[in-house]
Curated annotation (Swiss-Prot):
Reactions catalysed, as given in the entry: ATP + H2O + 4 H(+)(in) = ADP + phosphate + 5 H(+)(out)
Region (Disordered): 192-211
Lineage: Archaea, Methanobacteriati, Methanobacteriota, Stenosarchaea group, Halobacteria
EC number: 7.1.2.2
Name listed for the protein in its UniProt record: A-type ATP synthase subunit A
Species, as recorded: Haloquadratum walsbyi (strain DSM 16790 / HBSQ001)
Length: 585
């Protein structure tokens, strides 16, 4: 919402300033109204009203403003601009396009109070109508298509708060987002641009049970702990365990139609990496640039704290907008802990009663409000779309018992626990298979059986059983050593090692291994399973375990991930393993 566009009223003055929290007196405002604070017009939002005193959280640095400066009310809630131009763009936490602000300022250093619309108002888009005069449309119905990027067709919808009616006028050609393209008998006119309050979920008909996986291209996620399209997942882990790289991998290779990446309070150089890498990378499903399906929201750790609180809502509102068009959207929030810390700071400045570890008592409610906006929905126009929410959590010291992790755990259905010990051993992605879980496995099995292989659930369960047995045996090994174990248990440890090194480990920086299709994931585990079965046959025939594990073909299991022509490689490898083991007896 641009300051220049709003009919702002100078109807209040600053009473006090405490960091990002400003109190004003004489301000005629409602909860969540957007206001402009001080002579420079810093954007803020009303968060508390008591008698004649209004409390505002300011989304910019407040140094230098003081008492009796004006506070102007817009009378509108914090909203985002929705329309063509959202993709291939980078925003700050309140949807100001950073590249446009840089051009406006002539400098990468932005002044306070500078503003710009969320989508460019002067750009003309080719509008192709999908309705004719005389057709009847309701709220949410599609009236036309705009080619937003080479990957995504932007569907122009009747806004959800419109009554609808008979189409009286339809235009075709190039228009700006504010020009009317369709007129209705109700007197309403449809433009390509909509506004929507960020804290209000967009309406749907029904939330449905997800049945299709969000294929990530990461073997451990797709194979052992899958997330559904419309699912929720948390990635908690200590510093340096790989949360951000895992989020980047999901943003690059997840088979969603649209990616919304929210950098919430994390390091600036990590967002820089995204901005540098994504334009050069190809979307594996279309071959087009990744940025053509991506919108970035950057609110790094050196940006104002209050804007962290809004950036997550900005991201999920944009995600819901594309969901209404029938697209599958994946939202990455990195990290929800920084969002919670922003809530804690503002709560403490408001002198609210603190909850556990100083977080506000409403922490669980806010987290639930965010994650519950994810899901697989039937939209009001009859299409189906999904929003998958994947939030990184940064518990101090890797302590999963802290409030943000525990409250997130109660809400999400997929838990990918990152492990500092695995990261120190250079096992990446460092997802601990003993602590992680997915509650979507059973409902996604029919999809994997239909689209990959019938015995997908059995192969997954076999891998889980071997890894569980290894965890139990490791405790004995640490006490008495590996050589003291019986031969069959030594062989189990060797099979588990191949599972860890060739199935669970994956090199995010290798051009081939960075992405693994479900078919390749399945064939990898079947190759290790065959080695297991043939090796135990040889062991039963009296072959010493040392000879079994030292065959030449076995180490080639660790090279499956980097093979481009993996089907032929795995078929040859299976034959060689069988031949070499049978030669031993």
């Amino acid at each position: 919402m641009s300051q220049t566009e709003q009919a702002v009223r100078e109807d209040g003055v600053i009473r006090s300033v405490s960091g990002p929290v400003v109190t004003a007196r004489g301000l005629d405002a409602r909860m969540n109204d957007v206001v402009y604070v001080g002579d420079e017009g810093l954007m803020g939002e009303v968060i508390e009203i008591e008698d004649n005193v209004t409390t505002v959280q300011v989304y910019e640095e407040t140094s230098g403003i003081g008492p009796d400066e004006p506070v102007r009310n817009t009378g509108e809630p914090l909203s985002v601009d929705l329309g063509p131009g959202l993709l291939d763009t980078i925003y700050d936490g309140v949807q100001r396009p950073l590249d446009i602000l840089e051009d406006k300022m002539g400098s990468p250093y932005l002044d306070r109070g500078v503003d710009a619309p969320g989508i460019e108002l002067d750009t003309e888009w080719e509008f192709e109508p999908t309705v004719s005069e005389g057709d009847t449309v309701e709220s949410g119905d599609e009236v036309g298509i705009v080619e937003e990027t080479v990957t995504i067709d932007h569907k122009v919808l009747v806004p959800p708060d419109y009554e609808g009616g008979e189409v009286t006028t339809v235009k075709s050609g190039e228009f700006t987002v504010e020009e009317t393209v369709v007129e209705l008998s109700s007197g309403e006119s449809v433009q390509m641009r909509q506004e929507w309050p960020v804290r209000e979920p967009r309406p749907t008909v029904e939330k449905k049970t997800p049945r299709e996986p969000l294929v990530s291209g990461q073997r451990i996620l797709d194979g052992l702990f899958p997330i559904a399209k419309g699912g929720t997942a948390a990635i908690p882990g200590p510093f340096g365990s790989g949360k951000t790289v895992t989020q980047h991998q999901l943003a690059k290779y997840a088979d969603a139609d649209i990616i919304i990446y929210v950098g919430c309070g994390e390091r600036g150089n990590e967002m820089t990496e995204v901005i540098d890498d994504f334009p050069e990378l190809e979307d594996p499903s279309t071959g087009n640039p990744l940025m053509a399906r991506t919108s970035l929201i950057a609110n790094t750790s050196n940006m104002p704290v209050a804007a962290r609180e809004s950036c997550v809502y900005t991201g999920i509102t944009i995600a819901e907008f594309y969901r209404d068009m029938g697209y599958d959207v994946a939202l990455m929030a990195d990290s929800t802990s920084r969002w919670a810390e922003a809530m804690r700071e503002i709560s403490s400045r408001l002198e609210e009663m603190p909850g556990e570890e100083g977080y506000p008592a409403y922490l669980a409610a806010r987290l639930a409000q965010f994650y519950e906006r994810a899901g697989y929905f039937e939209n009001v126009n009859g299409t189906e779309g999904s929003v998958s929410a994947i939030g990184a959590v940064s518990p101090p010291g890797g302590d999963f018992s802290e409030p943000v992790t525990q409250n997130t755990l109660r809400i999400v259905k997929t838990f990918w626990a990152l492990d500092a010990d695995l990261a120190e051993r250079r096992h990446f992605p460092s997802i601990n298979w003993d602590e992680s879980y997915s509650l979507y496995k059973e409902q996604l099995d029919p999809w994997f059986q239909e689209n990959v292989e019938d015995d997908w659930p059995e192969e997954r369960q076999w891998a889980v059983d071997v890894l569980d047995e290894e965890s139990e045996l490791q405790e004995i090994v640490q006490l008495v050593g590996k050589d003291a174990l019986p031969d069959d248990q030594q062989l189990t440890l060797e099979v588990a090692r191949y599972l860890r090194e060739s199935y669970l480990q994956q090199n995010a920086f290798h051009p081939v291994d960075t992405y693994c299709s479900p078919e390749k994931t399945y064939l990898t585990v079947t190759a290790i399973h065959q080695f297991n079965d043939e090796a135990f046959e040889a062991l039963d025939a009296g072959v010493p375990v040392d000879e079994i594990i030292s065959i030449d073909a076995a180490p080639r299991l660790n090279r499956i991930g980097v093979q481009d022509d993996y089907e032929e490689y795995i078929a040859t490898l299976k034959e060689d393993i069988a031949t070499q083991l049978q030669e031993l007896y």
